[in-house]
């Protein structure tokens, strides 16, 4: 079987339907990159695209990097803080509500296995731990600085997250935490 299209902007694809409503499509849909698209019956999303060089992208695969704007903060022992901006946001992450220490929590869009990375930069510390909190409980993803320390700490791990999980940062001890995208941030990428 061959599917041919007359011009680059045309479509040459296989369309899978239920009751004449399209729910999946694979082929050359409006461009020359091969793609697999899915629909809820109203809106199409590209699940996978492969260009002429053989490179693939997954434009709706959840991935994000979140940070909080400002200069610095000194969260109280036991306080939770959040984020104000996304440096990268793909796949439906949202900032949700507000945390006790300012900023918003992050709403996870899809269940799955994620690579998570936490970076925390401090100007000073009296001994502190900053951990990613999932639904209010501190997780194993954390960084710790001894008393008298300053600088950048980072840690990463693979985490199982569920759609609807709410993520924030949980602080123990005392530290002056530097803010901004290059200072303190959380990154997640669904594997």
What is the predicted role of each segment?
Residues 25-27, 47-49, 105, 158:
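Short, surface-exposed charged micro-motifs
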Residues 29, 41, 107-111, 148-150, ...:
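Surface-exposed coil/turn segments at beta-strand junctions on protein surfaces, enriched
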Residues 55-130, 142, 156, 176-191:
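Terminal (often C-terminal
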Residues 131-136:
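Conserved aromatic beta-strand anchor motif in extracellular beta-sandwich/beta-rich domains
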Residues 140-148:
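Solvent-exposed serine/threonine-rich low-complexity stretches and specific carbohydrate-binding patches
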């Amino acid at each position: 079987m061959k599917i041919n299209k007359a011009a680059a902007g045309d479509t040459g694809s296989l369309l899978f339907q239920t009751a004449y409503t399209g729910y999946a499509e694979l082929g050359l849909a409006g461009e020359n990159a091969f793609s697999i698209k899915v629909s809820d019956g109203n809106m199409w999303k590209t699940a996978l695209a492969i260009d002429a060089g053989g490179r693939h992208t997954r434009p709706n695969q959840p991935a994000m990097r979140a940070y909080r704007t400002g200069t610095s903060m000194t969260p109280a022992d036991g306080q939770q803080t959040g984020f104000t901006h996304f440096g990268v946001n793909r796949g439906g992450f949202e900032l949700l509500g507000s945390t006790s220490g300012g900023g918003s929590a992050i709403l996870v869009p899809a269940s799955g296995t994620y690579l998570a990375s936490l970076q925390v930069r401090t100007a000073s510390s009296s001994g502190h731990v900053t951990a990613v909190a999932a639904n209010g409980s501190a997780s194993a993803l954390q960084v710790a600085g001894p008393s008298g320390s300053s600088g950048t700490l980072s840690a990463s791990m693979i985490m199982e997250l569920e759609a609807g999980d709410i993520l924030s940062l949980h602080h123990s001890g005392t530290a002056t935490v530097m803010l901004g995208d290059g200072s303190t941030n959380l990154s997640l990428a669904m594997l």
